[in-house]
Amino acid sequence: MARIGGVNVPVNKRVVVALTYIYGIGPSLASKICEGCGIGEDVLVSSLSDEDVVKIRNFIRSGCVVEADLRKEVAMNIKFLMDIGCYRGLRHRKKLPVRGQRTHTNARTRKGGTRLAVAVKKG
């Protein structure tokens, strides 16, 4: 396994696919990284030289927010919305869908499972 961006990427896959294992890098950004480093998209990770891996690491380090930094940034954005008390922040705080989805019949994942009432025998 090659270590790029703090993540072990699989060796037996193409570079474009392997880069998508890094949080924050999707298919389009992965192809831009390959193009910027001068590496073909159909090259396997196992056939990359050490210089190519260093090029990819430096490209990601210089121009991309990935992994822990990106997770922290997203969490801080959500916390900011909750702190200012805007509608989206209130929806996050109540653990309801944020982007206008209906909640009467759907949104089970976001709201949590249904609660079952337990019958108590009178005795």
From Swiss-Prot:
UniProt cross-references to Pfam families, sorted A to Z: Ribosomal_S13
SUPFAM superfamilies referenced in this protein's UniProt entry, alphabetically: S13-like H2TH domain (SSF46946)
InterPro entries: Rbsml_uS13_C, Ribosomal_uS13, Ribosomal_uS13-like_H2TH, Ribosomal_uS13_bac-type, Ribosomal_uS13_CS
Record-level Gene Ontology MF annotations: rRNA binding; structural constituent of ribosome; tRNA binding
Annotated GO CC locations: cytosol; small ribosomal subunit
Keywords on record: Ribonucleoprotein, Ribosomal protein, RNA-binding, rRNA-binding, tRNA-binding
GO biological process entries: translation
Origin: domain of life: Bacteria
Subunit structure: Part of the 30S ribosomal subunit. Forms a loose heterodimer with protein S19. Forms two bridges to the 50S subunit in the 70S ribosome.
Described function: Located at the top of the head of the 30S subunit, it contacts several helices of the 16S rRNA. In the 70S ribosome it contacts the 23S rRNA (bridge B1a) and protein L5 of the 50S subunit (bridge B1b), connecting the 2 subunits; these bridges are implicated in subunit movement. Contacts the tRNAs in the A and P-sites.
PANTHER family in the record: 30S RIBOSOMAL PROTEIN S13/40S RIBOSOMAL PROTEIN S18, SMALL RIBOSOMAL SUBUNIT PROTEIN US13M
Similarity field: Belongs to the universal ribosomal protein uS13 family.
Protein name: Small ribosomal subunit protein uS13
Species per Swiss-Prot/TrEMBL record: Anaplasma marginale (strain Florida)
Gene from which the chain derives: rpsM
